């Protein structure tokens, strides 16, 4: 047979193998999609989750612009899901959409591994271990951008494999164009994927150049396809120009405004947050490796390493793709660790950072799937046997089943109404026609969702404290807040006219022109503007506070009656993971029970008043503290300290018939409990010293009684 005949035969054989893998990969991918979609759909939260979900859903519902960089693709597709899905709350529909994104991502990971290795078991390992890790599962069933980002990670890797296997120049050109479009489209969601795009594009161009298929014309075409993928960003200036959305972020009607939003300048273009000092690069890298071992297991990490080691064998196919994927993982991990400026010692910030590790975990899962197939293949070659195929399937099955078993109870969110109840409690507690000055992601995003998407309390006006300091906020949003008077264009402690012509106003002036309405702050008040203090004070209103004119006299009995049962909150204390938004919401609602006694006690400590009135306030605070401390077995640890101090004040006052021995015993008991449960309190030494003194007093009192 001629050499040309051998070449044609090899090409035909390769084409047949690729064809079989392609059809098998599609069938397997569909099966993986169905299985993962079923699990994700079954465990979806029925209402709004925490984090950015409320804001993203509201932006989609209103067709506004989400926080930087805008996420236009997510916004438009979520709006489509809200319109087309005929069941569930608006939040549930977007949660379902994200669950389907996660299932597609799983099928693409399977497809990638199967096409690279020919191993269905390896593909199932990659898809299952990644999808059913706690981190991926948790963020695949919530209305967040991470699930769609996982989809694009899988899609870009699958297209890269497809390009490598393309047999003809025409097919390579077609895949390259589709890939260029998808690269552009992926940047319409989460920008962290640009690090993968910047690895894949040079690799594709190098392959085309090596095969002499890259010309100036083809490069121009690829650029046009990439640019076409960015078209969803047109939504930003259109939405901003129309200004129909009751909630939006930024003014993108100018090029400068568009670039400010697109480049995330309000957060810091290459940073996670504005004005934050984060953990060191080495700390974040070490935490990433530790987190990966927890999420995927050490065995998966080892298999990913094996995928690279097995490249040393001569008969391995597509080694450059394994190196490419490994390079993507390393570059992403190093860059993210460099720019993640959050302190991961704080559980909530750790929860923010770890979401971005999903992007690297997806690559590790693919490498592990390839590694499993490679280890089995090499072992079969050494043993000259095919008897390990069953072991390969058994390993993949065990890994996936273990992931589901380990994480199901944590990720089953079917009954999670925590953020929903938090927002509803805050809104329903408000008087008619009130103004709420929002502060922070938890109250801001959840209340906006309930107010704008679910139509709860349309009489209330929601104004964002932080946003009022931005020059775009009031020009865009004031018309959607008809019941609120703004004495200028921008909130600033220093009133005046800026060079741009904007009129600034302070909080005191804002409150004065809105005296006809009751105004509340949720949660907390902007520290940068203390002007309100000259004519207003903050009175506790559950998790929020009410701004009350100073001329109004505080009536403790009336206020206790108003705020004592302000919320209907039944969640157990401490039942949520500290890094979750559910934990933050639960903490806020529990601490709300303590705010009125704390306020009354503080009033007695600081205000100038007759001793009789002071004693009455101490007694009221003591009664309230005692009631909440003994009402629940588990409660916030600071309640012990506050109650102990209240007992000590009652003891010193001797204004009641209360037994001094009982008060001393209570003071000692709760100071001791507090010191045990909060050993890192800066006042720990003082508390221990006080305990020593109080025990002596108690002993002396008992001795006197005995005599």
Swiss-Prot record:
Lumenal side stretches: 377-707
Enzyme Commission numbers on file: 2.4.1.109
Keywords for this protein: Disease variant, Endoplasmic reticulum, Glycoprotein, Glycosyltransferase, Membrane, Transferase, Transmembrane, Transmembrane helix
Effect on the protein upon substituting residue 98 to Y: In SHDRA; decreased stability
An annotated Gene Ontology molecular function: dolichyl-phosphate-mannose-protein mannosyltransferase activity
Result of changing residue 453 to R: In SHDRA; decreased stability
Catalysed transformations (reactions): a di-trans,poly-cis-dolichyl beta-D-mannosyl phosphate + L-seryl-[protein] = 3-O-(alpha-D-mannosyl)-L-seryl-[protein] + a di-trans,poly-cis-dolichyl phosphate + H(+); a di-trans,poly-cis-dolichyl beta-D-mannosyl phosphate + L-threonyl-[protein] = 3-O-(alpha-D-mannosyl)-L-threonyl-[protein] + a di-trans,poly-cis-dolichyl phosphate + H(+)
TM segment ranges: 28-48, 71-91, 94-114, 141-161, 189-209, 222-242, 318-338, 356-376
GO cellular component: endoplasmic reticulum membrane
Compartment annotation: Endoplasmic reticulum membrane
GO aspect biological process, one term: protein maturation
UniProt-annotated glycosylation sites, renumbered to this chain: 407, 535, 568
Pfam families, alphabetized: TMEM260-like
Membrane topology, as annotated: Multi-pass membrane protein
Leader peptide range in chain numbering: none
Family: Belongs to the glycosyltransferase 117 (GT117) family.
Role summary: O-mannosyl-transferase that transfers mannosyl residues to the hydroxyl group of serine or threonine residues of proteins. Specifically glycosylates the IPT/TIG domain of target proteins, such as MET and MST1R/RON. TMEM260-mediated O-mannosylated residues are composed of single mannose glycans that are not elongated or modified.
Disease tied to this entry: Structural heart defects and renal anomalies syndrome: An autosomal recessive syndrome characterized by central nervous system, cardiac, renal, and digit abnormalities. Clinical features include ventricular and atrial septal defects, truncus arteriosus, tetralogy of Fallot, partial anomalous pulmonary venous return, renal cysts, renal failure, and generalized edema. Some patients show partial agenesis of corpus callosum.
Protein name in UniProt: Protein O-mannosyl-transferase TMEM260
Organism of provenance: Homo sapiens (Human)
Taxonomic classification: Eukaryota, Metazoa, Chordata, Craniata, Vertebrata
């Amino acid at each position: 047979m001629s050499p040309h005949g051998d070449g044609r035969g090899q090409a035909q054989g390769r084409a047949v193998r690729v064809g079989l893998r392609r059809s098998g990969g599609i069938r397997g991918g569909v099966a993986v999609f169905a299985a993962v979609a079923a699990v994700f759909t079954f465990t979806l939260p029925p209402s709004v989750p925490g984090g950015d979900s409320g804001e993203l859903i509201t932006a989609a519902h209103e067709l506004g612009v989400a926080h930087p960089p805008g996420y236009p693709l997510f916004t438009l597709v979520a709006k489509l899901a809200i319109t087309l899905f005929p069941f569930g709350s608006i939040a549930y529909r977007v949660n379902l959409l994200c669950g389907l994104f996660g299932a597609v991502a799983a099928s693409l990971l399977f497809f990638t591994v199967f096409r690279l290795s020919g191993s269905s078991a390896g593909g199932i390992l990659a898809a299952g271990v990644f999808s059913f890790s706690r981190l991926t599962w948790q963020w695949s069933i919530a209305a967040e951008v991470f699930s769609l980002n996982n989809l694009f990670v899988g899609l870009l890797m699958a297209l890269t494999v497809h390009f490598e296997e393309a047999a003809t120049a025409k097919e390579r050109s077609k895949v390259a164009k589709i890939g260029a479009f998808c690269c552009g489209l992926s940047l319409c969601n989460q920008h962290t994927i640009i690090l993968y795009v910047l690895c894949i594009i040079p690799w594709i161009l190098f392959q085309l150049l090596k095969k002499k298929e890259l010309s100036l014309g083809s490069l121009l075409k690829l650029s046009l396809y990439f640019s076409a993928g960015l078209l969803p960003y047109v939504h930003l200036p259109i939405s901003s120009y129309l200004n129909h959305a009751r909630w939006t972020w930024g003014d993108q009607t100018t090029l400068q405004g568009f670039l400010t939003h697109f480049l995330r300048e309000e957060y810091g273009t290459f940073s996670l947050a504005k004005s934050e000092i984060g953990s060191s690069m080495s700390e974040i890298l070490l935490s990433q490796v530790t987190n990966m071992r927890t999420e995927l297991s050490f065995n998966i990490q080892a298999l990913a390493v094996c995928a690279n080691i097995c490249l040393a064998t001569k008969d391995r196919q597509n080694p450059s793709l394994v190196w490419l994927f490994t390079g993507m993982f390393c570059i992403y991990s190093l860059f993210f660790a460099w720019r993640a400026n959050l302190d991961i010692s704080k559980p909530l910030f750790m929860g923010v950072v770890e979401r971005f590790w999903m992007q690297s975990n997806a690559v590790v899962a693919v490498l592990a799937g390839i590694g499993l197939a490679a280890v089995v293949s090499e072992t079969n070659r050494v043993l000259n046997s095919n008897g390990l195929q069953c072991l390969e399937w058994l390993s993949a099955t065990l890994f996936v089943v273990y992931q589901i078993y380990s994480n199901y109870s944590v990720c089953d969110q079917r009954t999670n109404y925590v953020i929903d109840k938090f927002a509803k409690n805050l809104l329903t507690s408000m008087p008619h026609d009130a103004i709420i000055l929002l502060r922070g992601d938890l109250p801001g995003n959840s209340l906006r969702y309930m107010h704008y998407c679910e139509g709860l309390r349309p009489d209330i006006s929601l104004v964002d404290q932080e946003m009022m300091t931005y020059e775009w906020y009031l020009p865009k949003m004031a018309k959607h807040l008809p019941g609120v008077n703004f004495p200028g264009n921008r909130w600033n402690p220093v009133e005046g006219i800026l060079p741009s012509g904007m009129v600034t106003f302070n909080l005191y002036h804002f409150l004065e022109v809105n005296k006809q309405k009751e105004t509340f702050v949720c949660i907390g008040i902007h520290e940068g503007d203390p002007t309100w203090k000259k004519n207003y004070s903050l009175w506790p209103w559950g998790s929020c506070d009410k701004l009350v004119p100073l001329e109004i006299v505080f009536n403790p009995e009336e206020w206790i009656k108003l705020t004592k049962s302000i919320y209907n909150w039944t969640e157990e204390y401490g039942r949520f993971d500290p890094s979750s938004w559910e934990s933050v919401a639960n903490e806020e609602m529990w601490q709300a029970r303590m705010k009125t006694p704390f306020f009354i006690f503080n009033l007695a400590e600081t205000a100038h008043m007759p001793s009789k009135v002071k004693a009455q306030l101490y007694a009221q605070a003591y009664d309230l503290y005692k009631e909440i401390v003994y009402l629940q077995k588990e409660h916030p640890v600071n309640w012990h300290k506050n109650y102990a101090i209240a007992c000590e004040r009652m003891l010193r006052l001797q204004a009641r018939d209360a037994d001094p021995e009982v008060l001393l015993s209570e003071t000692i008991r709760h100071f001791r409990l507090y010191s045990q449960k909060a050993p890192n309190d800066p006042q720990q030494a003082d508390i221990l010293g006080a305990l020593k003194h109080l025990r002596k007093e108690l002993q002396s009192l008992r001795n006197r009684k005995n005599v």
